């Protein structure tokens, strides 16, 4: 991997991780079209660290508040809306964690293909359009219930299917449940913290147990570039989502998926 490839892939990961457009659909393009080599396990860990740092630092006030309330609910048995939301985020993490443990190998073998990614990019883009068009957009994240959190957790588990988009499917599910676009995005991003932490830890453990050589310069590039691009992406997405809605992302997903299908048909 060259420094240009590391920069480009980290930039792509950072910008697409939190937008409802599927990071896997974008990360397959350099290898499928340009013939770039697989980015490797070590680089996967690096970009996970970068995107995790971005969402934690961006939501640092909320993270500290929720974490403090969560610990307080355990140690002091003090319960409030913040501790309740924290527990619901934990609940929403469980389906994806279990799904990942049970079906990761199956997904890697049978579903990680350009054809699947192209199809899911289009299908879930259309679902996002339909839900956003018909959503009531009335609730904030503190009106979350355990049933709604579990529903969002199941949606997050579905994001294991390449091309679905973790943020895309969870925002779609939250809009379907009547949450505002801002609340749907915030809860989706907060949900991402434990699941990215788990995924990054799993990859880090695999890396530690392997004999893969590590290039610190390339990994540092991955961490820094993915952090900066993800932070910028989160900031502007939350600023613009209420006014522009989901249609730009729907159109983009359909164009991307269709282009990928055409390219696959011709090759």
Curated annotation (Swiss-Prot):
Localization, UniProt: Cell inner membrane
Q: Which domain of life is it from?
A: Bacteria
Keyword Cell wall biogenesis/degradation on entry: yes
**Which keywords are on file for this protein?**
Antibiotic resistance, Cell inner membrane, Cell membrane, Cell shape, Cell wall biogenesis/degradation, Hydrolase, Membrane, Peptidoglycan synthesis, Transmembrane, Transmembrane helix
* Catalytic activity as recorded in UniProt: di-trans,octa-cis-undecaprenyl diphosphate + H2O = di-trans,octa-cis-undecaprenyl phosphate + phosphate + H(+)
Identify its protein family: Belongs to the UppP family.
- What is the protein's known function? Catalyzes the dephosphorylation of undecaprenyl diphosphate (UPP). Confers resistance to bacitracin.
Q: What's the protein here called?
A: Undecaprenyl-diphosphatase
Q: Which organism is it from?
A: Aliivibrio fischeri (strain MJ11)
Q: What is the lineage of its organism?
A: Bacteria, Pseudomonadati, Pseudomonadota, Gammaproteobacteria, Vibrionales
